[in-house]
Amino acid sequence: LQDLVERLGELPGFGPKSALRAALALLRMPRERAEALGGSILDLRRKLTFCSCCRALAACDPCPICADPDREDEVICLVGDLDSLISMEEGGFFHGRYHVLGGLLAPLDGVDASQLEIEPLRARLAKGLVRELVLAFGATLEAEATASHVKNLVAREFPEVAVSRLAQGIPLGAEVKHMDHETLRQSLVHRQKL
């Protein structure tokens, strides 16, 4: 039990208490369901691969998005991780291609550009099909560092590719009086004409 609790505790969002609760729930689960869950975890590692084009996890290579002939080849949405790609895709409003960096620059944590999927992105841009690269990162220091690095790389090596980023500011349904100062600053900087 302790071994399982420790392993579950390594997952994001699992502290010692939630890992213990999950382990106990697995113990109470009928044997067939627990074995099915274990099989699903094994299948996750065995059956998924990284798409050779966009670096997303998929059951096939190329992934369904890269294989879709109806997607726009001229626009790539650059995301830090698979979670971000899934969120963008669930919205149903982006019809271009994606590229997953596999993280963000985090010098304090020892994550530099060599650990990100920048070389495959560079290879895609070198083909000359892409006209715009949309940076879909959050508003963290790591996101800012990554955005700056990518923007500089593209400006230096692929000046014909426009670089844009998702707008930042006050979320829909929020009130100004409840916003932190940085969100208000970003909202003012990125204000739009009506």
Residue ranges, per PLM feature:
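Short cysteine-rich clusters marking metal-coordination/redox-active sites
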Residues: 51-54, 63-66
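Short metal-coordination and nucleic-acid-contact micro-motifs, chiefly zinc-binding Cys/His arrays
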Residues: 44-47, 59
